[in-house]
From Swiss-Prot:
PROSITE patterns membership: RIBOSOMAL_S11
Organism from which the protein derives: Halalkalibacterium halodurans (strain ATCC BAA-125 / DSM 18197 / FERM 7344 / JCM 9153 / C-125) (Bacillus halodurans)
Keyword rRNA-binding: yes
One Gene Ontology molecular-function label: rRNA binding
Protein name: Small ribosomal subunit protein uS11
Pfam families: Ribosomal_S11
One annotated GO biological process: translation
InterPro entries from the UniProt entry: Ribosomal_uS11, Ribosomal_uS11_bac-type, Ribosomal_uS11_CS, Ribosomal_uS11_sf
Quaternary organization: Part of the 30S ribosomal subunit. Interacts with proteins S7 and S18. Binds to IF-3.
GO CC terms: ribonucleoprotein complex; ribosome
Amino acid sequence: MAKKTNTRKRRQRKNVETGVAHIRSTFNNTIVTITDPHGNAISWASAGALGFKGSRKSTPFAAQMAAETAAKAAMEHGMKSIEVSVKGPGAGREAAIRSLQAVGLEVNMIKDVTPVPHNGCRPPKRRRV
């Protein structure tokens, strides 16, 4: 039987003018995903993927670098303007939005989509340091 050759689908260059930047900012990390208006991911970056480890992942600087990296990759696909949706209570929320603007993307709208429980699960206990 003949060997089956691996045919990998090459990543094609999408030409997307507008998109949505999803910023997920937790207490431990910040993840920035830039999608087209339908929700298909174009680029993403996170503080951990950029090499920040431990408590450095949760800093605003790490969030800024993650947003910058994701935005530059999206701009290679022709992105010019974005809507930003922010989720989570982390430290990198504002820093990520500011760095998206600084890279050269036009921010049309910022919305907070942090899930708020209607008295759902019990929250974690308070830290005593």
